[in-house]
Amino acid sequence: MYVGCQGIGTSRHELQFLVRHGVTHMDTSIDPDNFDLLRKSREEAAAEGVELEMIHIPIPESITLAEDPQRDKDLDAICGWIENAGKAGLRGLNYNFSVVGYQRTPNRYGRGGSVYSSFEFDKYDNDEPHPGGKIDRDEIFARIAYFLDRVIPVAE
């Protein structure tokens, strides 16, 4: 077992911060189209004693909302990202496949100017329709299967 972290950058300062706190593995957000940056970031992390294992990738709404033909173009891009990550030596890609996404209300502010992501039920408009419309369980699973059928063969 090891200590990992996500959501921090890959600057030398940030990597040294991780090492000082016993973190040996990380994932972060790096442009998945840029193979050279992926490889360089992984090498720089390793030089500081941290293994860059994964990166976060966005899943475009065209995929989660099944908007053809853009969905297939975006899936082609994700397949390219998988290939880049593999060539760069990354273990995987981190993503969130969600039709609705995170439901939030406006941010709240705390001490020292800190910002909190929040959800306050009394401020949430549950009657406002989502762009995805009403989607049943079978349709969601069909969209997930469509995604996985395209990306798993590339990842293997």
Describe these PLM feature segments.
Residues 1, 50-65, 124-131:
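N-terminal small/glycine-rich loop or linker at the start of catalytic domains
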Residues 9-31, 44, 48, 84-93:
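Catalytic domains of carbohydrate-active enzymes, especially glycoside hydrolases
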Residues 28-32, 50-53, 77-81, 118-120:
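Glycine-rich loops and low-complexity Gly/Arg-rich segments
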Residues 35-53:
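Glycine-rich, positively charged N-terminal anion/phosphate-binding segment
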